[in-house]
């Protein structure tokens, strides 16, 4: 089992369009952001991990920021993420999240994101076989370029912002969000 990440092109669009500088679920092998959180701080901390997203991100409560969240596709983890995002969207500082989760319509995390009216917008469904990730087992890759992995199931791409996030990183016509969606598609 390994953890996949978005392509560097998709992350570059997140960074240029919405100022994404934090990655909530990554590893030293698949991170795109300089500041990232991972599950194994005991080993990943040597490579820059800030620890668990669930316990250390609160240090940014006075600063805010723009985050990319692609959690392990496990409902319990996604529910914890939902609770943390919900709390962070209540901060008084600008907060933006670009989130990728499986298209599991009946699961509470997906339902909550679909139901957002005050802090969520620009919801996109990405079809199976219609989006790519970079495989998380790069250490085994003997090629020079990353191995792209085509998803085997549908996923949803969400943009969630509080009022400060909307003011700092506006996207009235969803052009910037659509560019991120485009970068997930198979080239």
Sequence positions of predicted segments:
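Class I S-adenosyl-L-methionine
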Residues: 1-69, 73-187
């Amino acid at each position: 089992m390994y953890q996949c990440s978005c392509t560097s092109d998709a992350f570059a669009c997140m960074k240029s369009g919405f100022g994404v500088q934090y990655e909530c679920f990554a590893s030293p092998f698949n991170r795109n952001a300089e500041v990232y959180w991972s599950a194994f701080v005991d080993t990943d901390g040597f490579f820059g991990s800030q620890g668990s997203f669930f316990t250390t991100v609160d240090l940014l409560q006075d600063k805010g920021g723009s985050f990319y969240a692609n959690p392990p596709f496990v409902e319990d983890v996604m529910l914890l993420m939902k609770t943390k995002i919900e709390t962070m969207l209540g901060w008084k500082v600008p907060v933006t999240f670009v989130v990728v989760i499986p298209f599991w319509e009946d699961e509470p995390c997906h339902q909550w994101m679909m139901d957002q009216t005050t802090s969520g917008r620009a919801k996109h469904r990405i079809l199976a076989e219609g989006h790519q990730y970079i495989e998380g087992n790069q250490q085994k890759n003997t090629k020079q370029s990353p191995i792209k992995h085509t998803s085997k199931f549908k996923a949803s791409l969400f943009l969630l912002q509080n009022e400060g996030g909307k003011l700092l990183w506006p996207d009235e016509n969803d052009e910037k969000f659509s560019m991120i969606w485009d970068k997930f598609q198979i080239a």
